[in-house]
Amino acid sequence: MLQCLKREPGFYRYLWGLTGPIALQNLITFTLGLMDTLMVSWLGNTQMAAVTTANVPVFLLISIVFGVQSGLSILVSQYWGKRDMEHISRAIGVAAMLGTGLTVVPAAVLYLWPVEIMDLLSNNHELSVLGAPYLKLIGISYVFNMLSSLYVSARRSAEDAGFGMKLFAMSTVLNTGLNYLLIFGKCGLPALGIQGAAVATLLARITEFAVCSFCAVRSRLLPIQWRAFFRPGWEMLRRFVKYSSPVVLNETAWGLGNSMLTVILGYTDNSVEMLAANAVMGNLNRLFLVVCFGLGAATAVIIGKSIGEGRSHQEVMDLSRTLLVFTALVGAGLTALSLLLVPTLFVPVVFPLFKLYGESAAIATALAVTGFLSIPLHAYSISAVTGVLRAGGDVFWSTLLDVGPQWCMALPLTALLALVLKADYWWIAAAIQSESLLKVPLCALRIRTGQWIHDVTVRKERGQ
């Protein structure tokens, strides 16, 4: 198996050159989420549970953003292999129009009916009242985030992974500073509490959008052809919908599944402790997965570009095998490191910092151990689904393999243990991670067939 790791000189330098900035970008983004959680936790566990519940529908918006972004990257990475700037501009134009429409409507719903939506997600009305002001504003921020994320995705697919890292570093510093000022009322500003976190995020997203707009006009690496951007044509719309709509549905269904896990925890007898522990460990788990997300995104760029360049079927297969084995080994190393930190750092230092004591700390420990043990499985499935299958244009199977195990295994098993059997939280934590046990072998079987390799830039003639 390790024989496949032998590659031409410079390959791993190139791989890490793509992975590093993307991983740092994800680290910055997840650190922002962690800082949000930390500052809100200082207000109390009830406030943190309210924000966690409010973020359930927001996570669906994030999933839509990521879905459109991923659909765009499929086309851009392969067109970049051909250096076809006109079609790249058309693809970005279609993505911007569709993405705006897909985020404006849910953002409006969240703004108009925040309490009613919150009441659907928890049996605790106090959380709904506390979280509503946050929910009203945070939805609007993702309209701007959609547009900036699309431009970042296009730059990344054109092998410029550093742009997103710099943009989100700037945004994170701004957001964190505004969080501190507006949540706690520093420097003469009003103490807005939870609502302050939403205002800070909205202002940071608007700034991101402004910077991306300026760079899109001035960029030499990826010069957008504005005529093609504003008039992308029906052929590009058809092609984008064909390859991106399954990805958008995939991410939306996956996001809904993750949101349902939070809803299940919100209906347990100890919902405040469950939600508080899940909020903290959700962010900490993602911090350890940033390298895996980076490798997955780098895999998508490399595979997509290779197909666009016209490499042979066997070359692409060998390349995918190398990338997947390497990612799984990196995941195993991260598991060893993270498990060492549970008794030495998380339990004695991190959990008290987030005001997690007693039952909340015990639940967080269970979520930490089960989550960290699953990192190699998550690492493989991230690269398999978002890197190999999607970049190869195999969007139907990538959707089925990503969503199926979650909805058919993890969700019903977690609901059964948490709500019906009232099982111990260790069993519930294990059930949350169970989808990867099914996803990994199914992904491996699909990739082994080689039927996932498609050149999505080729226009088929009528009658063919």
Predicted regions and their residues:
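Small-residue-rich hydrophobic transmembrane alpha-helices
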Residues: 48-108, 145-164, 275-342, 379-398
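Short runs within selected transmembrane alpha-helices of multi-pass transporters and secretion channels
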Residues: 69, 73, 138-157, 164-172, ...
